[in-house]
Amino acid sequence: MAIKKFKPTTPSRRFMTVSAFDEITRREPEKSLLAPLKKTGGRNSYGRVTVRHRGGGHKRRYRIIDFKRDKDGVPARVASIEYDPNRSARIALLHYVDGEKRYILAPNKLQVGDTVKSGEDAEIKPGNALKLKNIPVGTIIHNIELKPGKGGQLARAAGTMAQILAKEGKYAHIKLPSGEVRLISLECKATIGQVGNIDHENISIGKAGRKRWLGKRPHVRGVAMNPVDHPHGGGEGRTSTGRHPVTPWGKRTLGKKTRKRKASDKYIIRSRRARKR
């Protein structure tokens, strides 16, 4: 994937970069795999803001993605590589030999005309999905299940990948994009390869309005607010917080640990916050 730069015709244009979309082969999505997507503006069913800094943005339609890869033993041809406004990765349209069509996350180097397959007899090549017990140690993977049959949940963003470090008993040791090493059942499925659109991390948004196109509203600092709006607010002129940093609701933040102990902690071999050597 190439990144496109612009001539500095305006101050915001100077630093803005976009994807060249060289890998995109089809402009219109497959209609049978679309669903309506209603915007919430960060509000819950009571109309109260539960997630701040959301609202607006360009209208989207949801692309139904096959994260489960449960159509085992049936080969499919990659018909097109498409843009998906709901995620950073590209998506690939598959045409199965029995006539069914599905979208999957497009792995790096997957091209139109390639054949992909899922199941125990699938080859170890990008785009194929197998259970972890059938994937060799050291293989790069993505779209990893946490529970067998639930569908991939880990390593789905553009350019992300995980690696199988070892297999022990009923579990595989998986190194995740964050650096965390975690035990995952060998019965869980994963897709071979790295997620495509690997240059996504190098894109510069360039201006505030482009964030608004994405449905993201301004993130205002507490010290820039009035006292009625935030515990850090108020004061004459520019002032410090005057206290330990807190959330808008008065809870300690910036250093205060809030993560509760979970039953799944026993599956974490190495924390993502462990010092990297």
From Swiss-Prot:
The lineage of its organism: Bacteria, Bacillati, Bacillota, Clostridia, Halanaerobiales. Residues 253-277 have a biased composition (Basic residues). It comes from the Bacteria. Belongs to the universal ribosomal protein uL2 family. SMART domains: Ribosomal_L2, Ribosomal_L2_C. It comes from Halothermothrix orenii (strain H 168 / OCM 544 / DSM 9562). Gene3D superfamilies: 2.30.30.30, Nucleic acid-binding proteins, Ribosomal protein L2, domain 3. It holds the Pfam family Ribosomal_L2_C. This is Large ribosomal subunit protein uL2.
